[in-house]
Amino acid sequence: MIRSLILSTLLLIFLAGCSIFGSDKQAREPIADGLTPKALYELAEDKFSSGSIEQGIEKLEVILAAYPGSKYAIQARLDIAYNLFKRKKYNRAIIQLNEFIDRYPALPSTPYAYYLRGVIAEEKSSSILDKILTDSAQRDVQSVRDAYSYFALLIDTFPNSKYSEEVPKKLIILKNILAKHEFYIALYYTS
């Protein structure tokens, strides 16, 4: 008798706990508020056009969460990276591009992802003020190394891509910066 009373009480507590969690209205609402991926993408484009980049990125992230297999999700990932780049959020943009390249290694837009990743790393290595005040070879060159490896990987992976055409010139410039950096290190230790 006591045993069945204890079991009944535990069952009642368990069921009451389940009903508490199930009553949350927000948890049952769909992520995309019933919007199609196309409608979300158009909303994001409108946000970008009006200068609300963060809100546009949020709409694209909803596409990634709600419709990960759609064609809009593929483009959304690239658009997120590009707009993060425009906002100077370089690390987040590179993470997005790395995910894109890992997920879609053979799409026609993949060479663009490789190229944009290199451009972002190159841009990350300098700012307007840095170009005026210091020689780029005298600063930390990790971003320059990253840009060089990203561009070299683009040429190795997609040698016939239109994005590979101007990369050899970029590689020469980056290699010269790295060589000057090594030269400054040698000067420092020899003086």
Segments (PLM) and residue ranges:
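Acidic, polar-rich low-complexity tracts and alpha-helical solenoid repeat scaffolds
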Residues: 18-191
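Sec-dependent bacterial lipoprotein signal peptides
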Residues: 1-18
